[in-house]
Amino acid sequence: MSEKLAVNFAGLTFENPVTTASGTFGSGLEYSEFVNLDKLGAVTTKGVANVPWPGNPTPRIAETHGGMLNAIGLQNPGIDTLIARDLPYLHERNAKIIVNVCGRSKEDYVEVVERLAQEDVDMLEINISCPNVKAGGIAFGQKPEMAEDITKAVKKVAKQPVIMKLSPNVTDITEMAKAVEAGGADGVSLINTLTGMKIDVNRKTFAIANQTGGMSGPCVKPVAVRMVYQVANAVQIPILGMGGIQNTEDALEFLMAGATMVAVGTANFFNPYATSEIVDGLEAYVEREKLSSITEIIGCVK
């Protein structure tokens, strides 16, 4: 792999700017027959909580025009399984590891981050789209003061760089980015899914049991690119951009809008080779454009 693809994110060097979006790549094991995990900049795990979460009732997924809705409910086996099973597997394959963390309270997040402080993990991604059960169910990422507070709490105990995953379901995402930057975040990732709904007109009911779900896929990309651009012009910390990335051109849009790294999500479901193909495509682009480094295009659109 060309050294020209290397990027620095929050003080860490990644061989290329491509990772996986949490929840779309399992723990890496599920895709290992399609992708050499050490070829990716990093593997981002599915969200992990302090205890196993059962997830939402089924049906939990519905196809939509240009994407999909999901209401999995962050089902996961918990931090013990991640440490005992998933991390050793990723280490065997020389993958850089970003662990996505979820929780129902500030204490939940802190507990997981404290456990991970003892592990060989490269970076943490904190999912603040989770509902805060102690604040009436509002997501941590929907109020700036809550986002700043949770950022400060996890930064106090974290041993790895911390990036905060921002929800697009807010009035002004730049205010959320500024809040987590003030809380000490080392970076931000965006966007998480947009809230959507689909109705089954034949059954005259909701297409998914949870009624609403997170919308992802190509349909959200223009919103995601716009938000990445806005955040890049509002904060000084680096951005992991995501939302509808299917191919190299999509990834380039995010980089030019101001993202330092990109994450591929829904595309993994219909093309398990997507991440690997994008790495190859970026390498070809750098050579074709005669760039000395992929970083030359980051934020080039003003």
What are these regions (language model features)?
Residues 295-302:
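A short, charged, Gly/Pro-tolerant segment at domain boundaries
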Residues 49-54, 131-133, 195-198, 269-271:
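Short gly/pro/ser/thr-enriched loop/turn and capping motifs at secondary-structure boundaries
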Residues 32, 80-83, 87, 110, ...:
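Predominant activation on well-ordered alpha-helical scaffold segments within soluble catalytic domains
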